[in-house]
């Protein structure tokens, strides 16, 4: 979109293989040090590139935003940087601090408890299980990595046993599968949260904000994922006034500027609960098309109607997108799980692949090399494929 709007696009990436590497929409790609593992060298190289190529706007696209935010003082001397402060980003990224903030603003969120150690986990777990079902996850995580979902109380572990006996069997199974992480994985510096499980439909958002005002927004259905609770691979724009109002109030109250996303659960009776915040670009960006106005929202949000919030840029009604390869993988869940193959086929038909572009096909072939590279890294470091894809850029609260 940026290139089609007449802008020159330069990409700085720490991974050797990435989708933009061969794209005809990119003027030039640069390989930079890992933001996570070589933060100072990364920021030095970014500053050099910004100066050398006279970059006017720097747009972080994933968790490198947290490292860029730590270098805004030096980078901001040379170009506009589309980030908020590192202090604000940290608060929103931290899964417990975000919940506390949203609750203080009077916005609906699930009951969420902070767990700082294995001992706290062991003490809290039996008490919480008496109250209901809980989701356990690290406060610093992304794409549902390491999330532990509760085992359904209706799963038939004990065959024809009574409901009461079957429920007890479930809880025993849940305890066996939900032992505390190792001491290295959970600590005061890297705690977990236990969040009350809310049954309902998952809805996600992507917004561009400027000084507390939304200038671009989409709410989207993300019903197909990698695994049962993994990263989204299918995105469909939906109009949802309740979600938009929740996001608008939050952005206004915090004065946020930059790209931001939220994950919501909507219950059967229409109650909305925000469960996480992603203070960065999310997959909802794929739902915008050239001409929708997103480029203007990113580059010049302070102009006229956008600044006054008289017009919020949104995707066209019915806009859909998917990541084709992992979407194909999700069909197995429909065949062997609880999904509907017919619904999956309906979703597939007429949905564009975000990687494939008829006039720019090289990124489509490059994705196989990207996956292979991530698979090798995953094997080497004993990571999931999703974790391997963000291994060099993820941020877990570290400060320079």
Predicted ranges, named:
Residues 79, 87-112, 122-127:
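Glycine-/Pro-rich loop/turn segments that contact NAD(P) or position catalytic residues
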């Amino acid at each position: 979109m940026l290139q089609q709007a007449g802008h020159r696009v330069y990409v700085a990436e720490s991974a050797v293989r990435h989708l933009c590497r061969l794209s005809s929409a990119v003027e030039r790609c640069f390989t930079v040090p890992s933001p996570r593992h070589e933060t100072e060298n990364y920021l030095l190289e970014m500053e050099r590139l910004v100066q050398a190529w006279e970059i006017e706007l720097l747009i972080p696209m994933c968790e490198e935003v947290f490292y860029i935010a730590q270098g805004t003082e030096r980078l901001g001397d040379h170009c506009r940087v589309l980030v908020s402060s590192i202090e604000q980003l940290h608060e929103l990224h931290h899964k417990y601090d975000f919940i506390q903030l949203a609750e203080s603003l009077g916005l609906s969120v699930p009951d969420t408890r902070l767990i700082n150690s294995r001992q706290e986990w062991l003490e809290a777990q039996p008490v919480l299980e008496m109250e209901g079902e809980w989701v356990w996850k690290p406060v610093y995580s992304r794409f549902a990595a390491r999330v532990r979902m509760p085992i359904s109380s209706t799963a038939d572990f004990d065959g024809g046993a009574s409901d009461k006996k079957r429920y007890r069997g479930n809880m025993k199974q849940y305890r066996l599968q939900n032992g505390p992480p190792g001491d290295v994985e959970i600590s005061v510096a890297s705690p977990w949260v236990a969040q009350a499980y809310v049954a309902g439909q998952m809805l996600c958002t992507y917004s561009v904000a400027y000084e507390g005002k939304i200038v671009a927004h989409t709410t989207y259905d993300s019903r197909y994922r990698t695994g049962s609770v993994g990263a989204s691979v299918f995105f469909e724009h939906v109009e949802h006034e309740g979600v938009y109002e929740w996001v608008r109030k939050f952005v206004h109250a915090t004065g946020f500027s930059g790209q931001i996303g939220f994950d919501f659960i909507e219950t059967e009776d229409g109650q909305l609960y925000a469960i996480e915040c992603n203070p960065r670009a999310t997959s909802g960006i794929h739902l915008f098309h050239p001409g929708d106005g997103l480029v203007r929202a990113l580059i010049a949000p302070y102009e006229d109607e956008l600044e006054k919030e008289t017009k919020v840029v949104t995707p066209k009604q019915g806009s859909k997108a998917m990541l084709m390869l992992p979407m194909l993988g999700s069909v197995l869940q429909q065949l062997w799980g609880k999904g509907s193959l017919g619904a999956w086929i309906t979703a597939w038909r007429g949905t564009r692949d975000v990687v494939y572009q008829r006039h720019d096909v090289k990124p489509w072939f490059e994705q196989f090399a990207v996956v292979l590279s991530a698979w090798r890294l995953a094997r080497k470091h004993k990571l999931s494929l999703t974790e391997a894809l963000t291994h060099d850029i993820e941020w877990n609260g570290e400060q320079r």
